[in-house]
Amino acid sequence: MMSQVSHSQEGSGRFWNKFKSSTKSLSTSLAHLSIKAEKDGDTVNTTLVHKGLVKFYENQHPFQGFPGWLGEKEDLPNERKILDTQVKHDMKKQNSRHFSPSFSNRRKASSEDPMGTPSSNGNTPEYTPASKSFQDIYNNHTSSSSATPRRASSRPTRPSAGQEFRASLGRSKTSNSFNTSSTPTPPPDASSGVMAMKDRLKRRNNDYGF
């Protein structure tokens, strides 16, 4: 009889030592339970202590699973669902952490400067009206045109019809005067020279009595 009592006390002592070593934050989980409103059930799995232990291991991050001494797995929450929930939560938290800095900075800048006024650090570009841009383009074009010397056109200008007529009339007068002055006097007619020679021969014959 005494050996059975000592054996049971030794077993309970090992249980409580294991309980103390594996439930360092048990008080935090038990704090979420409203002990006044809840009562122990009729079974071991429905006691307040058991519920607190299940809640404690379920909220561990990362989830390590339920210890075997806590009870049968069929009586405990689904470990696979708990792991999937934690993974989804971690991914969502990581994405929001990467997205939030840039989004919050843009949102902060827009809230501080809703009218697009350039900030003091010079990162925000200055807004330029469209009319000013067109005016600058026109001024640049005008200054470049005045600075560049105009090239003389190598293409000859075509004269008008009146100019061509006056030029052709002047050329015809010049050619007529040149022809008049440079044309040689035609020699005397050859037939008239022959007749004069015959007349001289006749007079000479008459003088000599032939």
From Swiss-Prot:
Residues 117-141 have a biased composition (Polar residues). It holds the Pfam family Mso1_C. Residues 88-210 are annotated as: Disordered. One of its GO terms (biological process) is membrane fusion. It comes from the Eukaryota. The modification Phosphoserine is found at S102. One of its GO terms (cellular component) is cellular bud membrane. Involved in secretion. Component of the secretory vesicle docking complex. Present with 1380 molecules/cell in log phase SD medium. Interacts physically with SEC1. This is Protein MSO1. The gene is MSO1.
